[in-house]
Structures are given as C-alpha cells and as structure tokens.
Regions:
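Short, compact, well-ordered microdomains
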Residues: 64-86
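Intrinsically disordered, low-complexity regulatory regions
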Residues: 2-65, 85-86
Length: 86
C-alpha cells in the first residue's frame, strides 16, 4: 500500500483526479472515465470521453437513460483506448 493520499484503498492506481470525491460518490461510473493514470500516448484518446461524461452528468437529469448513456460512452471510450494500443 502506498502513502500517496490519491491512491485507492486497493493501492492499485491513483484515484481519479478528474472528478471530485462528491462526484464519484454520486455517480460511481465516473471513476472509469479518468485518464491521468494512462500512458501519455493513450491519454488523448480517453480525454474527450471524460469531458463528455462530465457534460452528461452536468446537463442531463439523473434517470435510467442517463445511466445507459454513460455506460455506452464507457464502452466507446474503452474501444478507442484499445484502438491506440500497439
């Protein structure tokens, strides 16, 4: 376990810096949109999805369709990042 205050309880990698603890508590799926932990060449592929996730939670009412939108956005983000892995 690391002494880094940004590390998760599991110590696997740092907690998302892109969202506040309050945002993560309200919408746990947001933890999957962070990108600061990725290697620099992969961050540009992930960053726009993080920004769009932030826009979605800021502008859409919390309901089942918003959850579906975030889940599908996460699928797209994962594919975009994997497309850039050599």
């Amino acid at each position: 376990m690391t002494d880094d205050p940004k590390a998760t309880a599991s110590g696997i990698h740092p907690s998302p810096a892109e969202f506040t603890p309050e945002q993560l508590q309200a919408d746990p799926i947001l933890r999957f949109f962070h990108y600061a932990h990725l290697p620099l060449p992969l961050q540009p592929a992930s960053r726009p999805f993080c920004e769009l996730a932030r826009h979605i939670v800021a502008t859409l009412p919390r309901n089942a369709e918003r959850t579906v939108a975030l889940r599908k956005l996460l699928e797209a983000k994962d594919a975009a990042v994997r497309a850039n892995v050599p």
